[in-house]
Amino acid sequence: MQDSIEQYMQAVGQQARKASRVLSSASTHTKNNALSAIYTALVNHEPEILAANAVDMQKGRDSHLDSALLDRLELTPTRFKGMLQGLKDVIALTDPIGEITDLAYRPSGIQLGKMRVPLGVIGMIYESRPNVTLEAASLALKSGNAIILRGGSEALQSNKAIATAIQHGLKVAGLPEHAIQVIETADRAAVGQLITMTEYVDVIVPRGGKSLIERISNEARIPVIKHLDGNCHVFIDVEADLHKALPIALNAKTHRYGVCNAMETLLVHEEIAEEFLPRIAELYAEKHVELRGCQETRRILGSSVKTATEEDWYTEYLAPILAIKVVEHIDQAIEHINKYGSHHTDAIVTENYSKVRKFLAEVDSSSVMINASTRFADGFEYGLGAEIGISTDKIHARGPVGLEGLTSQKWIVFGDGQIRH
């Protein structure tokens, strides 16, 4: 069986590499035509896709998947329309491929610049949500990349049905159908093959739980664009405007709990804690948020607040639970964020410009917010359109990864017969 999986994955990789060479030189017009053809194919295949999803949902219920996982797995007609709208949004995005920047003449007479190009072949590994299949496929195609998609086994039938429609659209548009492939086996050995096929795959993008991403990071022989956690912080400075601080702290935690840009720890300057904490605690109580605080937080709010442990400062709850720490000054807040945070998104609320500059310079995160909710750390909110993920790495892409994050740059040189002396 292992040999057959290896042979299957090698064939998938070879086909993807071949298709990527065609896509790399495809015009914007050609790629948009293909995306439009995929849109039409998806509309025509909607009954089959929803029926396949119903099969996955029933299997999930029979396997006793938890309700949150089932919710992410389900495709309703409304969610399907949302997927189609996301595809239209990608069509409307500016194509970064072929863009030439930084043109300048050198003393030798040559003209030097940079040109944006596709990465090549992307391997995408993700869980549960079938809408990711279309999001990732459309972003890859628009940026001139081939993509190999390995969704969770719980969504296998949904993903196969979506892929059938996508490949039909590619054929109609005259592009190679293997530009977008879904791995059609639930065997985990396929993942092991995908993340080590250095001759065929240029980058791996994992989206899912911490254990999945840790495994991919540890075992991959190919560069990985990833984030492990979204342990985000909001620091309420002594010079914060509480008319801003209260709604920001409430929104960052309670707008959505199970997302990577939700706040997990609230830091409050000691000189404003007596005034701020009782007011924000009342708002959290209305939302049934469990509070876990340091000793000073519990002194102010009372023993109904649970004692925060060292583990709490590291935890991404993805739930209505919040850790709260009172700090002496901005330096202690920054030190806490850089020690316990996940380099995802962190915010300060203050009216002091010098503290703003200090926070921006010293907080080591992919997104740093000033007087705004951490929930804005999102490709759509950043004007990137859809995103393939959010990276907390520092190499290549950092923060929400949209079209440009799926590209690289090559140096280009224009000469007129120059030789080097």
UniProtKB/Swiss-Prot annotation:
The keyword Glycoprotein does not apply. This is Gamma-glutamyl phosphate reductase. PANTHER family: DELTA-1-PYRROLINE-5-CARBOXYLATE SYNTHASE, GLUTAMATE SEMIALDEHYDE DEHYDROGENASE. GO terms for molecular function: glutamate-5-semialdehyde dehydrogenase activity; NADP binding. Keywords: Amino-acid biosynthesis, Cytoplasm, NADP, Oxidoreductase, Proline biosynthesis. The gene is proA. Its EC number is 1.2.1.41. It comes from Acinetobacter baylyi (strain ATCC 33305 / BD413 / ADP1). CDD domains: ALDH_F18-19_ProA-GPR. GO terms for biological process: L-proline biosynthetic process.
